Swiss-Prot record:
Functional description taken from the UniProt entry: Cytochrome P450 monooxygenase; part of the gene cluster that mediates the biosynthesis of campesine G, a dimeric indole piperazine alkaloid that shows good insecticidal activity Galleria mellonella. Within the pathway, cpsD acts as a dimerase that simultaneously catalyzes one C-C bond (C3-C3') and two C-N bonds (C2-N16' and C2'-N16) coupling reactions between campesines B and C to produce a heterodimer with unexpected 6/5/6/6/6/6/5/6 eight-ring scaffold called campesine D.
Organism (species): Aspergillus campestris (strain IBT 28561)
Protein name: Cytochrome P450 monooxygenase cpsD
Gene Ontology annotations for the cellular component aspect, listed alphabetically: membrane
Topology relative to the membrane: Single-pass membrane protein
Region: Disordered, residue numbers: 528-547
Residue sites binding heme per the record: C476
Keyword Protease: no
Family listed: Belongs to the cytochrome P450 family.
Enzyme Commission number: 1.-.-.-
InterPro entries: Cyt_P450, Cyt_P450_E_grp-IV, Cyt_P450_sf
Cofactor: heme
GO-annotated biological processes: alkaloid metabolic process; secondary metabolic process
Amino acid sequence: MSPLDDVVSPSQWMLWRLTGAALVVTLITSVIIVAADLYRHWQKRRSVGQIPLIHDGSWLSPKLQWRRPSFDAESEMARAYKKYSKNGKPFAWKTQNGLDIVIILPPECGKEYYSLPREKCSFMHWVRNEMFLNTVVDVTWRVPVEAVQVSSQSAPMDRLGRVIFDHLDRVLPLFLPGPGDHEWRQVNGSDMMDSLVRDLALGLFFTPGFGEESGLRRQMSAYMDGLAGQWFARQEAPYILEHLVWRLSPTCRRFQSTIQTVRQIVVPEVRRRIQQIRSNDKDGCFLLSDLLIKQALKRGTFCREGKTGEQETLEELIVDEIMFMYMETVAPFHLVTTCMVFRIMRHPEYVAPLREELDRALKICGGEWSFEIFNHTPKMESFTREILRLHNPTSISGARCVMEPITIPSLGMALERGTHISLPSRFIHTDPENYPDPMTFNGYRFYDEASGTCNVQKTLAPSEAWLPFGIGTSACPARLLGTRTCQALFAKILMDYDVGQMDDKHVPLQMWLLGIYVPSPTISISARRRDARRTHEALGSKLKPEE
Protein backbone atom coordinates (compact mmCIF):
# COMPACT_ATOMS: atom_id res chain seq x y z
CA MET A 1 0.00 0.00 0.00
CA SER A 2 1.32 3.40 -0.96
CA PRO A 3 1.76 6.04 1.78
CA LEU A 4 -0.41 8.32 -0.38
CA ASP A 5 -3.35 5.98 0.11
CA ASP A 6 -3.68 7.22 3.70
CA VAL A 7 -4.09 10.88 2.64
CA VAL A 8 -5.60 10.68 -0.85
CA SER A 9 -8.99 9.18 -1.55
CA PRO A 10 -9.52 7.05 -4.67
CA SER A 11 -11.65 9.79 -6.23
CA GLN A 12 -8.93 12.41 -5.67
CA TRP A 13 -6.32 10.06 -7.07
CA MET A 14 -8.45 9.54 -10.19
CA LEU A 15 -8.90 13.31 -10.54
CA TRP A 16 -5.13 13.82 -10.37
CA ARG A 17 -4.57 11.18 -13.01
CA LEU A 18 -7.16 12.75 -15.32
CA THR A 19 -5.68 16.20 -14.76
CA GLY A 20 -2.21 14.89 -15.51
CA ALA A 21 -3.44 13.18 -18.66
CA ALA A 22 -5.19 16.38 -19.76
CA LEU A 23 -2.00 18.37 -19.23
CA VAL A 24 0.00 15.86 -21.25
CA VAL A 25 -2.55 15.94 -24.08
CA THR A 26 -2.58 19.75 -24.00
CA LEU A 27 1.21 19.86 -24.10
CA ILE A 28 1.42 17.39 -26.97
CA THR A 29 -1.32 19.24 -28.89
CA SER A 30 0.44 22.57 -28.36
CA VAL A 31 3.72 21.13 -29.58
CA ILE A 32 2.00 19.71 -32.67
CA ILE A 33 0.32 23.06 -33.43
CA VAL A 34 3.56 25.01 -33.08
CA ALA A 35 5.56 22.40 -34.98
CA ALA A 36 3.01 22.39 -37.82
CA ASP A 37 3.25 26.18 -38.05
CA LEU A 38 7.04 26.11 -38.12
CA TYR A 39 7.07 23.31 -40.68
CA ARG A 40 4.58 25.15 -42.91
CA HIS A 41 6.71 28.29 -42.90
CA TRP A 42 9.89 26.28 -43.40
CA GLN A 43 8.30 24.69 -46.48
CA LYS A 44 7.37 28.09 -47.86
CA ARG A 45 10.81 29.53 -47.19
CA ARG A 46 12.46 26.52 -48.78
CA SER A 47 10.30 26.91 -51.90
CA VAL A 48 11.90 30.26 -52.78
CA GLY A 49 15.44 28.95 -52.42
CA GLN A 50 18.14 31.60 -52.18
CA ILE A 51 15.88 34.52 -53.09
CA PRO A 52 16.13 37.24 -50.38
CA LEU A 53 13.07 37.19 -48.11
CA ILE A 54 11.57 40.36 -46.63
CA HIS A 55 9.44 39.61 -43.58
CA ASP A 56 8.87 40.46 -39.92
CA GLY A 57 11.23 37.81 -38.55
CA SER A 58 8.52 35.57 -37.12
CA TRP A 59 7.75 32.08 -38.40
CA LEU A 60 4.61 31.63 -36.33
CA SER A 61 1.01 32.62 -36.97
CA PRO A 62 -0.09 35.82 -35.18
CA LYS A 63 -2.03 33.94 -32.47
CA LEU A 64 1.10 32.01 -31.51
CA GLN A 65 3.35 35.04 -31.27
CA TRP A 66 4.10 36.13 -27.72
CA ARG A 67 4.78 39.63 -28.96
CA ARG A 68 4.32 41.10 -32.41
CA PRO A 69 7.68 42.10 -33.89
CA SER A 70 8.21 45.74 -34.81
CA PHE A 71 8.24 45.84 -38.60
CA ASP A 72 7.69 48.75 -41.00
CA ALA A 73 6.39 46.72 -43.94
CA GLU A 74 5.98 49.65 -46.32
CA SER A 75 9.52 50.95 -45.78
CA GLU A 76 10.99 47.46 -46.09
CA MET A 77 9.14 46.87 -49.34
CA ALA A 78 10.40 50.21 -50.71
CA ARG A 79 13.95 49.35 -49.67
CA ALA A 80 13.73 45.93 -51.33
CA TYR A 81 12.46 47.53 -54.55
CA LYS A 82 15.50 49.80 -54.71
CA LYS A 83 17.95 47.09 -53.71
CA TYR A 84 16.65 44.19 -55.79
CA SER A 85 13.99 45.18 -58.36
CA LYS A 86 15.98 48.14 -59.68
CA ASN A 87 18.92 45.81 -60.22
CA GLY A 88 16.92 43.19 -62.08
CA LYS A 89 16.70 40.76 -59.16
CA PRO A 90 13.68 39.15 -57.50
CA PHE A 91 12.90 39.20 -53.81
CA ALA A 92 10.36 37.29 -51.74
CA TRP A 93 7.69 38.82 -49.54
CA LYS A 94 5.63 37.18 -46.80
CA THR A 95 2.07 37.95 -47.84
CA GLN A 96 -0.78 39.51 -45.92
CA ASN A 97 -2.08 36.29 -44.40
CA GLY A 98 1.37 35.41 -43.08
CA LEU A 99 1.11 31.86 -44.41
CA ASP A 100 2.30 32.32 -47.98
CA ILE A 101 5.28 33.89 -49.67
CA VAL A 102 5.05 35.77 -52.96
CA ILE A 103 8.05 36.26 -55.23
CA ILE A 104 8.25 39.88 -56.39
CA LEU A 105 9.75 39.89 -59.87
CA PRO A 106 11.57 42.83 -61.47
CA PRO A 107 9.23 44.88 -63.71
CA GLU A 108 10.97 43.82 -66.91
CA CYS A 109 10.20 40.15 -66.14
CA GLY A 110 6.45 40.70 -66.23
CA LYS A 111 6.21 40.08 -69.96
CA GLU A 112 7.63 36.60 -69.43
CA TYR A 113 4.58 35.39 -67.50
CA TYR A 114 1.63 37.77 -67.64
CA SER A 115 0.43 36.59 -71.06
CA LEU A 116 0.57 32.91 -70.18
CA PRO A 117 -2.83 31.16 -70.27
CA ARG A 118 -4.78 30.94 -67.02
CA GLU A 119 -4.21 27.20 -66.96
CA LYS A 120 -0.55 27.95 -66.26
CA CYS A 121 -0.73 31.18 -64.23
CA SER A 122 -3.97 32.12 -62.51
CA PHE A 123 -4.79 35.40 -60.79
CA MET A 124 -8.06 34.14 -59.32
CA HIS A 125 -6.39 31.14 -57.69
CA TRP A 126 -4.03 33.61 -56.04
CA VAL A 127 -7.01 35.62 -54.76
CA ARG A 128 -8.66 32.47 -53.46
CA ASN A 129 -5.56 31.44 -51.55
CA GLU A 130 -4.92 34.90 -50.12
CA MET A 131 -8.47 35.55 -48.89
CA PHE A 132 -9.44 32.02 -47.78
CA LEU A 133 -12.24 31.94 -50.33
CA ASN A 134 -12.19 28.20 -50.90
CA THR A 135 -15.09 27.77 -48.45
CA VAL A 136 -16.91 30.98 -49.43
CA VAL A 137 -17.16 31.23 -53.21
CA ASP A 138 -15.43 29.66 -56.19
CA VAL A 139 -13.63 32.65 -57.65
CA THR A 140 -12.21 30.50 -60.45
CA TRP A 141 -15.62 30.28 -62.15
CA ARG A 142 -15.25 32.15 -65.44
CA VAL A 143 -18.89 33.22 -65.90
CA PRO A 144 -18.71 36.33 -63.63
CA VAL A 145 -15.59 37.54 -65.45
CA GLU A 146 -17.29 37.10 -68.81
CA ALA A 147 -20.38 38.93 -67.53
CA VAL A 148 -18.27 41.91 -66.46
CA GLN A 149 -16.55 41.93 -69.85
CA VAL A 150 -19.98 42.14 -71.50
CA SER A 151 -20.85 45.09 -69.24
CA SER A 152 -17.99 47.06 -70.78
CA GLN A 153 -19.57 46.93 -74.23
CA SER A 154 -21.20 50.09 -75.51
CA ALA A 155 -24.91 49.32 -75.00
CA PRO A 156 -24.65 47.81 -71.47
CA MET A 157 -22.26 50.59 -70.42
CA ASP A 158 -24.71 53.24 -71.57
CA ARG A 159 -27.60 51.71 -69.63
CA LEU A 160 -25.52 51.08 -66.51
CA GLY A 161 -24.26 54.66 -66.65
CA ARG A 162 -27.80 56.00 -66.57
CA VAL A 163 -28.62 53.69 -63.67
CA ILE A 164 -25.61 54.97 -61.74
CA PHE A 165 -26.43 58.65 -62.24
CA ASP A 166 -30.09 58.09 -61.34
CA HIS A 167 -29.03 56.23 -58.21
CA LEU A 168 -26.55 58.97 -57.28
CA ASP A 169 -29.36 61.53 -57.31
CA ARG A 170 -31.17 59.37 -54.75
CA VAL A 171 -28.30 58.40 -52.44
CA LEU A 172 -26.14 61.55 -52.29
CA PRO A 173 -28.71 63.53 -50.23
CA LEU A 174 -28.74 60.68 -47.71
CA PHE A 175 -25.14 61.43 -46.76
CA LEU A 176 -24.60 65.06 -47.80
CA PRO A 177 -26.93 68.10 -47.74
CA GLY A 178 -29.91 67.71 -50.05
CA PRO A 179 -31.54 70.26 -52.39
CA GLY A 180 -32.39 73.47 -50.57
CA ASP A 181 -30.03 72.76 -47.67
CA HIS A 182 -27.08 75.14 -48.04
CA GLU A 183 -25.58 74.68 -44.59
CA TRP A 184 -22.12 73.21 -44.18
CA ARG A 185 -22.09 69.62 -42.96
CA GLN A 186 -18.99 67.88 -41.62
CA VAL A 187 -18.63 64.11 -41.86
CA ASN A 188 -15.84 61.57 -41.58
CA GLY A 189 -14.55 61.31 -45.14
CA SER A 190 -13.71 57.62 -45.42
CA ASP A 191 -16.75 56.40 -43.47
CA MET A 192 -19.16 58.58 -45.43
CA MET A 193 -17.75 57.54 -48.81
CA ASP A 194 -17.80 53.88 -47.79
CA SER A 195 -21.49 54.04 -46.83
CA LEU A 196 -22.35 56.02 -49.96
CA VAL A 197 -20.58 53.56 -52.26
CA ARG A 198 -22.27 50.59 -50.59
CA ASP A 199 -25.65 52.08 -51.42
CA LEU A 200 -24.54 53.02 -54.93
CA ALA A 201 -23.23 49.52 -55.68
CA LEU A 202 -26.58 47.94 -54.83
CA GLY A 203 -28.02 49.83 -57.79
CA LEU A 204 -25.73 47.90 -60.14
CA PHE A 205 -27.30 44.58 -59.08
CA PHE A 206 -30.87 45.31 -57.99
CA THR A 207 -33.71 47.59 -59.03
CA PRO A 208 -34.47 50.57 -56.75
CA GLY A 209 -36.39 49.60 -53.65
CA PHE A 210 -35.71 45.88 -53.86
CA GLY A 211 -34.96 44.35 -50.46
CA GLU A 212 -35.68 47.49 -48.45
CA GLU A 213 -38.22 45.82 -46.15
CA SER A 214 -36.02 42.76 -45.61
CA GLY A 215 -32.88 44.80 -44.87
CA LEU A 216 -30.88 43.75 -47.92
CA ARG A 217 -28.54 46.73 -47.73
CA ARG A 218 -27.69 45.93 -44.11
CA GLN A 219 -27.11 42.26 -44.91
CA MET A 220 -24.91 43.00 -47.93
CA SER A 221 -22.84 45.33 -45.76
CA ALA A 222 -22.65 42.58 -43.13
CA TYR A 223 -21.37 40.25 -45.87
CA MET A 224 -18.58 42.68 -46.73
CA ASP A 225 -17.60 43.15 -43.10
CA GLY A 226 -17.92 39.43 -42.44
CA LEU A 227 -15.71 38.53 -45.39
CA ALA A 228 -12.95 40.68 -43.91
CA GLY A 229 -13.68 39.33 -40.42
CA GLN A 230 -13.36 35.69 -41.42
CA TRP A 231 -10.12 36.52 -43.21
CA PHE A 232 -8.64 38.08 -40.08
CA ALA A 233 -9.84 35.20 -37.89
CA ARG A 234 -8.40 32.52 -40.17
CA GLN A 235 -5.12 34.22 -41.05
CA GLU A 236 -4.31 34.86 -37.38
CA ALA A 237 -5.02 31.27 -36.33
CA PRO A 238 -2.38 28.53 -36.42
CA TYR A 239 -2.20 26.92 -39.83
CA ILE A 240 -3.36 23.50 -38.63
CA LEU A 241 -6.47 25.00 -36.97
CA GLU A 242 -7.65 27.13 -39.89
CA HIS A 243 -10.51 24.81 -40.91
CA LEU A 244 -11.58 24.44 -37.28
CA VAL A 245 -11.72 28.22 -36.93
CA TRP A 246 -13.93 28.43 -40.03
CA ARG A 247 -16.38 25.96 -38.51
CA LEU A 248 -16.39 27.08 -34.87
CA SER A 249 -15.29 30.72 -34.65
CA PRO A 250 -18.21 33.06 -33.74
CA THR A 251 -16.99 35.52 -36.39
CA CYS A 252 -17.01 32.88 -39.12
CA ARG A 253 -20.34 31.43 -38.01
CA ARG A 254 -21.95 34.89 -38.11
CA PHE A 255 -20.57 35.33 -41.61
CA GLN A 256 -22.02 32.00 -42.73
CA SER A 257 -25.36 33.00 -41.21
CA THR A 258 -25.24 36.27 -43.17
CA ILE A 259 -24.72 34.34 -46.41
CA GLN A 260 -27.81 32.25 -45.69
CA THR A 261 -29.86 35.36 -44.89
CA VAL A 262 -28.87 37.07 -48.16
CA ARG A 263 -29.72 33.90 -50.06
CA GLN A 264 -33.20 33.86 -48.54
CA ILE A 265 -33.76 37.47 -49.63
CA VAL A 266 -32.25 37.33 -53.12
CA VAL A 267 -32.93 33.79 -54.38
CA PRO A 268 -36.61 34.50 -55.23
CA GLU A 269 -35.56 37.58 -57.22
CA VAL A 270 -32.87 35.63 -59.07
CA ARG A 271 -35.39 32.90 -59.85
CA ARG A 272 -37.77 35.52 -61.25
CA ARG A 273 -35.05 37.03 -63.45
CA ILE A 274 -34.00 33.64 -64.78
CA GLN A 275 -37.58 33.00 -65.87
CA GLN A 276 -37.81 36.48 -67.39
CA ILE A 277 -34.61 36.00 -69.40
CA ARG A 278 -35.61 32.50 -70.53
CA SER A 279 -38.93 33.88 -71.76
CA ASN A 280 -36.99 36.35 -73.96
CA ASP A 281 -38.34 39.33 -72.01
CA LYS A 282 -34.87 40.87 -71.79
CA ASP A 283 -35.52 44.60 -72.14
CA GLY A 284 -35.48 45.16 -68.39
CA CYS A 285 -32.52 42.84 -67.76
CA PHE A 286 -29.32 44.85 -68.01
CA LEU A 287 -27.93 45.05 -64.47
CA LEU A 288 -24.76 43.17 -63.53
CA SER A 289 -26.82 40.41 -61.94
CA ASP A 290 -28.78 40.04 -65.19
CA LEU A 291 -25.61 39.88 -67.26
CA LEU A 292 -24.31 37.19 -64.91
CA ILE A 293 -27.43 35.07 -65.43
CA LYS A 294 -27.42 35.64 -69.20
CA GLN A 295 -23.81 34.57 -69.50
CA ALA A 296 -24.41 31.41 -67.48
CA LEU A 297 -27.39 30.55 -69.68
CA LYS A 298 -25.33 31.25 -72.79
CA ARG A 299 -22.65 28.82 -71.65
CA GLY A 300 -25.34 26.26 -70.93
CA THR A 301 -24.06 25.47 -67.46
CA PHE A 302 -24.47 26.66 -63.93
CA CYS A 303 -21.84 24.35 -62.47
CA ARG A 304 -18.61 25.69 -61.03
CA GLU A 305 -15.33 23.89 -60.51
CA GLY A 306 -15.88 20.81 -58.37
CA LYS A 307 -19.62 21.47 -57.95
CA THR A 308 -22.69 19.55 -59.07
CA GLY A 309 -26.34 20.44 -59.23
CA GLU A 310 -27.00 18.21 -56.21
CA GLN A 311 -24.63 20.19 -54.00
CA GLU A 312 -26.08 23.62 -54.54
CA THR A 313 -29.01 25.09 -56.37
CA LEU A 314 -28.73 27.23 -59.45
CA GLU A 315 -30.11 30.24 -57.61
CA GLU A 316 -27.73 29.94 -54.65
CA LEU A 317 -24.78 29.77 -57.01
CA ILE A 318 -25.83 33.05 -58.65
CA VAL A 319 -26.47 34.76 -55.30
CA ASP A 320 -23.05 33.74 -53.98
CA GLU A 321 -21.45 35.33 -57.04
CA ILE A 322 -23.55 38.49 -56.68
CA MET A 323 -22.38 38.91 -53.09
CA PHE A 324 -18.74 38.52 -54.04
CA MET A 325 -19.08 40.83 -57.05
CA TYR A 326 -20.71 43.40 -54.75
CA MET A 327 -17.64 43.30 -52.50
CA GLU A 328 -15.34 43.60 -55.53
CA THR A 329 -17.35 46.64 -56.62
CA VAL A 330 -17.52 48.49 -53.31
CA ALA A 331 -13.90 48.14 -52.19
CA PRO A 332 -12.11 49.83 -55.14
CA PHE A 333 -14.85 52.44 -55.62
CA HIS A 334 -14.49 53.50 -51.99
CA LEU A 335 -10.69 53.52 -51.97
CA VAL A 336 -10.34 55.50 -55.21
CA THR A 337 -13.19 58.04 -54.99
CA THR A 338 -12.32 58.95 -51.41
CA CYS A 339 -8.83 59.94 -52.52
CA MET A 340 -10.29 61.93 -55.43
CA VAL A 341 -12.32 64.02 -52.99
CA PHE A 342 -9.37 64.34 -50.60
CA ARG A 343 -7.25 65.71 -53.45
CA ILE A 344 -9.59 68.57 -54.33
CA MET A 345 -9.70 69.41 -50.63
CA ARG A 346 -5.92 69.69 -50.67
CA HIS A 347 -5.71 71.24 -54.15
CA PRO A 348 -8.77 73.51 -54.64
CA GLU A 349 -7.11 74.99 -57.74
CA TYR A 350 -8.46 71.99 -59.69
CA VAL A 351 -12.09 72.66 -58.77
CA ALA A 352 -12.93 75.48 -61.20
CA PRO A 353 -11.22 73.98 -64.31
CA LEU A 354 -12.82 70.58 -63.73
CA ARG A 355 -16.25 72.11 -63.20
CA GLU A 356 -15.94 74.21 -66.34
CA GLU A 357 -14.91 71.15 -68.33
CA LEU A 358 -17.82 69.11 -66.97
CA ASP A 359 -20.21 71.95 -67.73
CA ARG A 360 -19.05 72.05 -71.36
CA ALA A 361 -19.30 68.26 -71.63
CA LEU A 362 -22.85 68.31 -70.26
CA LYS A 363 -23.85 70.86 -72.89
CA ILE A 364 -22.33 68.69 -75.63
CA CYS A 365 -24.38 65.75 -74.33
CA GLY A 366 -27.61 67.71 -74.21
CA GLY A 367 -27.51 68.35 -70.47
CA GLU A 368 -28.04 64.68 -69.64
CA TRP A 369 -25.75 62.88 -67.20
CA SER A 370 -24.28 59.75 -68.78
CA PHE A 371 -20.90 58.09 -69.21
CA GLU A 372 -20.72 59.82 -72.61
CA ILE A 373 -19.72 63.10 -70.93
CA PHE A 374 -16.36 61.59 -69.92
CA ASN A 375 -15.43 61.29 -73.58
CA HIS A 376 -15.24 65.10 -73.51
CA THR A 377 -13.36 65.66 -70.22
CA PRO A 378 -9.61 65.16 -70.83
CA LYS A 379 -8.62 67.06 -67.68
CA MET A 380 -10.89 64.83 -65.61
CA GLU A 381 -9.31 61.82 -67.30
CA SER A 382 -5.82 63.02 -66.41
CA PHE A 383 -6.89 63.80 -62.84
CA THR A 384 -8.33 60.28 -62.49
CA ARG A 385 -5.23 58.69 -63.94
CA GLU A 386 -2.99 60.58 -61.51
CA ILE A 387 -5.16 59.33 -58.63
CA LEU A 388 -4.75 55.77 -59.89
CA ARG A 389 -0.99 56.25 -60.15
CA LEU A 390 -0.32 57.85 -56.78
CA HIS A 391 -3.21 56.45 -54.74
CA ASN A 392 -3.81 53.00 -56.16
CA PRO A 393 -4.89 50.79 -53.25
CA THR A 394 -2.56 47.87 -53.94
CA SER A 395 1.16 47.61 -53.23
CA ILE A 396 1.63 44.71 -55.66
CA SER A 397 -0.12 43.93 -58.94
CA GLY A 398 -0.17 41.36 -61.70
CA ALA A 399 -0.21 38.57 -59.11
CA ARG A 400 -0.49 34.95 -60.21
CA CYS A 401 -0.55 31.48 -58.71
CA VAL A 402 1.60 29.13 -60.81
CA MET A 403 -0.63 26.23 -61.89
CA GLU A 404 1.99 24.36 -63.94
CA PRO A 405 5.80 24.60 -63.69
CA ILE A 406 7.08 27.59 -65.66
CA THR A 407 10.42 29.29 -66.24
CA ILE A 408 11.44 32.95 -66.15
CA PRO A 409 14.19 32.83 -68.81
CA SER A 410 15.84 36.18 -68.03
CA LEU A 411 16.40 35.11 -64.43
CA GLY A 412 17.06 31.45 -65.17
CA MET A 413 14.39 30.71 -62.57
CA ALA A 414 12.11 27.68 -62.55
CA LEU A 415 8.85 28.15 -60.64
CA GLU A 416 7.00 25.18 -59.19
CA ARG A 417 3.26 24.64 -59.03
CA GLY A 418 1.72 26.65 -56.18
CA THR A 419 4.30 29.46 -56.28
CA HIS A 420 2.90 32.98 -56.00
CA ILE A 421 4.46 35.74 -58.13
CA SER A 422 3.73 39.44 -58.59
CA LEU A 423 5.11 42.87 -59.53
CA PRO A 424 5.80 45.83 -57.16
CA SER A 425 3.23 48.19 -58.68
CA ARG A 426 3.19 50.86 -55.96
CA PHE A 427 6.90 51.42 -56.25
CA ILE A 428 6.86 51.25 -60.04
CA HIS A 429 4.28 54.06 -60.00
CA THR A 430 6.46 56.18 -57.70
CA ASP A 431 9.76 55.52 -59.47
CA PRO A 432 11.25 58.80 -60.83
CA GLU A 433 12.56 56.90 -63.86
CA ASN A 434 8.94 56.20 -64.82
CA TYR A 435 7.28 59.43 -63.63
CA PRO A 436 9.23 62.66 -62.95
CA ASP A 437 8.76 64.07 -59.45
CA PRO A 438 6.59 61.04 -58.65
CA MET A 439 5.53 61.96 -55.10
CA THR A 440 4.04 65.29 -56.21
CA PHE A 441 0.40 65.13 -57.21
CA ASN A 442 -0.04 66.62 -60.68
CA GLY A 443 -3.61 66.33 -61.88
CA TYR A 444 -2.60 67.38 -65.39
CA ARG A 445 0.37 65.03 -65.65
CA PHE A 446 -1.29 63.04 -68.44
CA TYR A 447 -3.08 65.96 -70.10
CA ASP A 448 -1.66 67.06 -73.46
CA GLU A 449 -2.18 70.82 -73.40
CA ALA A 450 -1.17 71.25 -77.04
CA SER A 451 -3.92 68.95 -78.33
CA GLY A 452 -6.25 69.30 -75.34
CA THR A 453 -6.53 65.52 -74.99
CA CYS A 454 -5.93 62.65 -72.58
CA ASN A 455 -6.36 59.23 -74.13
CA VAL A 456 -8.60 56.99 -72.01
CA GLN A 457 -7.08 53.92 -73.65
CA LYS A 458 -3.77 54.75 -71.99
CA THR A 459 -5.60 54.84 -68.66
CA LEU A 460 -7.05 51.38 -69.23
CA ALA A 461 -4.16 49.67 -71.06
CA PRO A 462 -1.67 48.03 -68.65
CA SER A 463 2.06 48.23 -69.24
CA GLU A 464 5.22 47.52 -67.26
CA ALA A 465 5.06 51.06 -65.86
CA TRP A 466 1.26 51.25 -65.48
CA LEU A 467 -0.34 48.58 -63.29
CA PRO A 468 -3.42 49.87 -61.44
CA PHE A 469 -5.59 47.20 -63.08
CA GLY A 470 -3.13 44.33 -63.16
CA ILE A 471 -1.68 43.20 -66.46
CA GLY A 472 -1.91 40.55 -69.16
CA THR A 473 -4.55 37.85 -69.35
CA SER A 474 -5.84 38.64 -65.86
CA ALA A 475 -6.10 42.43 -66.11
CA CYS A 476 -9.23 43.70 -64.37
CA PRO A 477 -12.19 43.08 -66.73
CA ALA A 478 -14.20 45.87 -65.07
CA ARG A 479 -11.59 48.60 -65.45
CA LEU A 480 -13.69 50.71 -67.83
CA LEU A 481 -16.91 50.38 -65.81
CA GLY A 482 -15.01 50.93 -62.56
CA THR A 483 -13.18 54.02 -63.82
CA ARG A 484 -16.35 55.58 -65.21
CA THR A 485 -18.31 54.88 -62.02
CA CYS A 486 -15.63 56.52 -59.86
CA GLN A 487 -15.63 59.51 -62.21
CA ALA A 488 -19.43 59.69 -62.05
CA LEU A 489 -19.49 59.82 -58.24
CA PHE A 490 -16.67 62.35 -58.12
CA ALA A 491 -18.25 64.52 -60.85
CA LYS A 492 -21.62 64.66 -59.07
CA ILE A 493 -19.97 65.68 -55.79
CA LEU A 494 -17.88 68.26 -57.64
CA MET A 495 -20.85 69.80 -59.45
CA ASP A 496 -23.42 69.59 -56.65
CA TYR A 497 -21.29 70.51 -53.63
CA ASP A 498 -18.69 72.91 -52.33
CA VAL A 499 -16.06 70.98 -50.41
CA GLY A 500 -13.97 72.62 -47.70
CA GLN A 501 -10.22 72.95 -48.02
CA MET A 502 -7.91 70.71 -46.03
CA ASP A 503 -6.22 72.72 -43.29
CA ASP A 504 -3.30 70.33 -42.78
CA LYS A 505 -1.55 70.06 -46.15
CA HIS A 506 0.83 67.37 -44.91
CA VAL A 507 -1.50 64.81 -43.35
CA PRO A 508 -1.17 61.48 -45.23
CA LEU A 509 -4.20 60.78 -47.40
CA GLN A 510 -3.67 57.02 -47.16
CA MET A 511 -2.30 54.54 -44.66
CA TRP A 512 -0.74 51.12 -45.16
CA LEU A 513 -2.90 48.25 -43.86
CA LEU A 514 -1.59 44.74 -44.48
CA GLY A 515 -0.35 45.58 -47.97
CA ILE A 516 -3.37 47.71 -48.92
CA TYR A 517 -3.42 51.51 -48.98
CA VAL A 518 -6.68 52.69 -47.39
CA PRO A 519 -7.94 56.29 -47.03
CA SER A 520 -6.93 57.99 -43.81
CA PRO A 521 -9.70 57.41 -41.23
CA THR A 522 -9.06 60.76 -39.50
CA ILE A 523 -9.82 63.17 -42.36
CA SER A 524 -13.20 64.92 -42.27
CA ILE A 525 -15.08 66.32 -45.25
CA SER A 526 -16.98 69.61 -44.98
CA ALA A 527 -19.58 69.95 -47.73
CA ARG A 528 -22.32 72.40 -48.68
CA ARG A 529 -24.94 72.12 -51.38
CA ARG A 530 -24.20 74.47 -54.27
CA ASP A 531 -26.71 76.97 -55.61
CA ALA A 532 -27.42 76.09 -59.24
CA ARG A 533 -27.53 79.82 -60.07
CA ARG A 534 -24.05 80.52 -58.76
CA THR A 535 -22.10 82.67 -61.19
CA HIS A 536 -19.04 81.55 -63.11
CA GLU A 537 -16.83 83.82 -60.99
CA ALA A 538 -18.01 82.08 -57.85
CA LEU A 539 -16.77 78.76 -59.20
CA GLY A 540 -13.21 79.93 -58.76
CA SER A 541 -13.70 81.40 -55.31
CA LYS A 542 -12.02 80.00 -52.27
CA LEU A 543 -13.99 77.02 -51.06
CA LYS A 544 -13.61 76.92 -47.33
CA PRO A 545 -16.31 76.52 -44.67
CA GLU A 546 -17.05 79.45 -42.44
CA GLU A 547 -15.65 79.34 -38.95
